[in-house]
């Protein structure tokens, strides 16, 4: 048994249609139909419509219908015929009313006999003329049509345009936004991050959306169709600039919800060390199957040019004006230099011309700079002009004072070697407490001493009792030797009783850090957020009244300070491996807005092979780490590795970690730090650090290449504004070179 569906949208039918209806199985006598089957479900939907597209849709359904003009009397007669026809065959009648020119869509579902024929007649009404027709085809089996349901209307997605925060040249990207497509704000953030990474360099994931007036958007319901918004990454504040609202967006994504649209959210994206710890030497644009995602050849070409041309470098800028002119420096990298216009904007923000934007740039020899690659060639000094007139005879000549200023800048970036006078500088002394011989010389002694007695002896040597250990740690792990110590904590090697895996147990004495408890809380809070192959993992944390216990990942090779004291200096290949791993860890931290503040060899753990070569480096000890929401002013760190802005107390941020990494790279290659003072006196040391002037003395640097010297010079810039970022370290040509991670022997 089937259901016969009749949809009546009009009140005008011809004789052929009426004959078809009378000959249909529904005319069977009621006695031949089982009583339970004599059920008629009637659904009448009457709605007024004046929308042109609805009329057009109805006309498409009835393009084969005969639609002559009919009078009111003819319609009345046809209505009576239809009533008589249905009343003779249905247990419940179908109500059919007189057309008023606005009747649209009357459904009738009638139970019939077991004959398997289905009739679906679609009739439309033209609301303007009051005339329509009943669709008819030769056989009922061939007139099945899908009836759209008005109960589940398709919601139209909002068409929203998004800009990159502070980027006045980025033309924006337009995407459809709806509650069906994005169930949460975080999902929209993920898609915006992926789309922006394909077109511009961004410092991290999209975290905030603003309107063009700077108001923060907190829900999808606040977005308006056809409006523009600004995407902010990490903790960036809204930058009120003249966004490129009149330009054509880079990518206008279709509004279709079809999953077959492979171009909607292309997953072809640069591999980034921020999230997966990959080395910078890996291919930044992996091939994507199925074509270029979201992609025009113009965008792909632009990204390719940026990758091949742009590299981190510091340029010197001479501001146009009255002589002697102001001399400034600017760090160019992939974030602020994706195009020629972006570089002009960056220069404008630094030189601050009285005439406004920088319009023209010249080299020191007076050659106009017209391409992006010109900023990354052999010239590193440029004149910046606005709309003012240029006197080529005088403007490109440097006065003595201007030349001296440029020479001072170049001196701070010196990469040539000088002869070292006097004895070779030494590494600073590693602070370490002295414990009884039981701990240092005979760490385990399990054969002669019961385990509990050995644990008690180890803890007693540090002023602790065996019962002070938390039960879940005492029952799960076997205590080993002391492997590290600091001002507030001590670190034991422990072993899991069931698996035999080694871990490190850090015990922080709260009594020794009175008033600094927030550092302990910050360390645990930060480490719980981290997951990176070159950062020590936190396995378990237990907080008690007197101590904080942290079970950490164990690295077998010890810390980098001990490795340096054993081998004195490392080869460039070994140093490259370590700086890659350290740079990847810092980039990951900085992308989350976290600064370590105590990067030094004692806090870098290394894994060695059987020949003593470094295979892996991991960053540890987050006791001073914190999240950066604004400039920090607390003076902390280790004197040898402290950055100038910390000593000057002018406020500092993420780049103090880059300075410390530059000191470490210098030490790896020659065995001593760039800034030293006699007898380890702090005042002369701090003066040297603030000056930012150091040398690459021979013979210790005679066999070391210019590439790594250039990297060190950029990492040890006293001015944090022009100092390399952690990403710039990974992008440098020396760091990218020899990607194979091949191990070579130490330099003895």
UniProtKB/Swiss-Prot annotation:
GO biological process, one term: intracellular signal transduction
Protein kinase domain sequence ranges: 477-735
Pfam entry (one): Pkinase
Protein's recorded name: Serine/threonine-protein kinase CG17528
Catalytic residues identified in the record: 598 (proton acceptor)
PROSITE patterns: DC (PS50309), PROTEIN_KINASE_ATP (PS00107), PROTEIN_KINASE_DOM (PS50011), PROTEIN_KINASE_ST (PS00108)
UniProt binding sites for ATP: 483-491, 506
Source species: Drosophila melanogaster
ATP-binding among keywords: yes
Gene3D superfamilies assigned: Doublecortin domain, Transferase(Phosphotransferase) domain 1
PTM annotation (Phosphoserine): residues: 67, 70, 73, 87-89, 93
Top-level taxonomy: Eukaryota, Metazoa, Ecdysozoa, Arthropoda, Hexapoda
